[in-house]
Amino acid sequence: MAFALRGVTAKASGRTAGARSSGRTLTVRVQAYGMAAEYIWADGNEGKPEKGMIFNEMRSKTKCFEAPLGLDASEYPDWSFDGSSTGQAEGNNSDCILRPVRVVTDPIRGAPHVLVMCEVFAPDGKPHSTNTRAKLREIIDDKVTAEDCWYGFEQEYTMLAKTSGHIYGWPAGGFPAPQGPFYCGVGAESAFGRPLAEAHMEACMKAGLVISGINAEVMPGQWEYQIGPVGPLALGDEVMLSRWLLHRLGEDFGIVSTFNPKPVRTGDWNGTGAHTNFSTKGMRVPGGMKVIEEAVEKLSKTHIEHITQYGIGNEARLTGKHETCDINTFKHGVADRGSSIRIPLPVMLKGYGYLEDRRPAANVDPYTVARLLIKTVLKG
């Protein structure tokens, strides 16, 4: 590669060498860099007014390396960023530390480039207050590990036109046909934004994320993808990486994706959630229904603790309508999508399996969901 600026030319040619001057042109031989690593983290602005209805908490920046590294996070150095610009520090002491914890292939740039999920640490070396992954790590002891918790995360999102902020595919200044034909819909009259949803699914697969599927949702312009089944730390990492990919691909499509729990508050329209399927080893074996019932009883006693951490703005979604239970009520049932905790019918018929927590909003922190379920079910 060659760089020229104001009569200065630099040519990449193997190892770094000296500079050679010839007239007004300075030629510098430099090492060609061979890999880009996108360091990704969650900021401290989620839910703040300046974010509006977008609820996008993802940040990232690129670090280049001379030679490709592997997929082991320990190979990647810590890095820093300006926390005063992300809601994570004051200007007079603004440096925060990024520590790599998960590395996957970058499906956009392609191999050997990578995406690097990071935890955020304060200058004193302690986990930052926004580092919810660290809080999850702390609760995973030998007992939790032995229970081999599995999670399946149903991430809903709503597409918005970049220029207008209007829901993608909706008529300008108006509403589409009533809900009904759009859930798992097919055809230009029913499915809005499929190219982005498909591109996102493909990117997640290429990155090696455990994405289980996608579907158009009840409200037009609303989609869902599923991550899992995976363990607790993998759940948080993969949901956050998948969210970053969704936002990044949206740049190319001119579509903004929002995790706002209730993007349309006028009319008969569904909200946007993140139903979380959860099981322990004891739930997944014959006779596990008893363990599931015990877990539901524990969850009924910690409803307020969960609901206050299940996403900002969730009260607008959990109204008792549109396949939700009222936010102030705890209810469970078999095949009941108006419940707080749903037991799928096949689980009841088999007598073992998993439960579905239908309370989390689309903008919920996945590390927090994983931690609270462990805390209540296994440590309560």
Curated annotation (Swiss-Prot):
Record's keyword terms, sorted: ATP-binding, Chloroplast, Ligase, Nucleotide-binding, Plastid, Transit peptide
Boundaries of every GS beta-grasp domain copy: 35-125
A molecular function GO annotation: glutamine synthetase activity
Any Pfam family: Gln-synt_C
Stretches assigned to the GS catalytic domain: 132-380
Cellular-component GO terms for this entry: chloroplast
GO BP: glutamine biosynthetic process
PROSITE patterns reported for this sequence: GLNA_1, GLNA_ATP, GS_BETA_GRASP, GS_CATALYTIC
InterPro entries assigned to the protein according to its UniProt record, in alphabetical order: Gln_synt_N (IPR008147), Gln_synt_N_sf (IPR036651), Gln_synth/guanido_kin_cat_dom (IPR014746), Gln_synth_cat_dom (IPR008146), Gln_synth_gly_rich_site (IPR027303), Gln_synth_N_conserv_site (IPR027302), Glutamine_Synthetase (IPR050292)
Subcellular location field: Plastid, Chloroplast
Record-listed E.C. numbers: 6.3.1.2
Catalysed reactions, semicolon-separated: L-glutamate + NH4(+) + ATP = L-glutamine + ADP + phosphate + H(+)
Family according to the record: Belongs to the glutamine synthetase family.
Subunit structure: Homooctamer.
Protein name: Glutamine synthetase, chloroplastic
UniProt source species: Chlamydomonas reinhardtii (Chlamydomonas smithii)
